[in-house]
Amino acid sequence: MDSGSRRYCLGNGRSTYTVLMTTPDYTPYVAYARGQAALRRQQAAERYRLAWHVARQIAEFLRREYRPARIIAFGSLVHPDVFGLHSDIDIAVEGIPWPEYLRAWNGVEEQFPAFKVDLIDVDIVSDLMRQRIQEEGQEL
């Protein structure tokens, strides 16, 4: 590496890239890219905290209005390393009969528009999905 070259490590939280720049004029661009990556990580962390807050509010709403047997958060919400700026909230419920389940889902969408919410009826999903919810899910 000659005196006019520098190595820079750039990352997005999931992977890191090493870039060899042959001119010191790229230094401001690298600093900007690093700053943007840090900002996205901070925004994702804030959205993650907000998502958990909203998930707990959804659970309170469902308990008050529909009295499900269980309410379980799963998906990216229980995996902070994969939760991102565009992640939704996945919530599984047990014990809400049809068509009350459809009313519950509609109520959740109307009451909590800040996030896309997938409200899953555990009683009708595949065995594989039910197993995934049971293994990774967290009770709300």
Region spans (language model):
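Catalytic core of pol beta-like nucleotidyltransferases
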Residues: 2-69, 79-85, 95-140
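Glycine-rich beta-strand-to-loop/alpha-helix junction loops that act as flexible
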Residues: 73-76
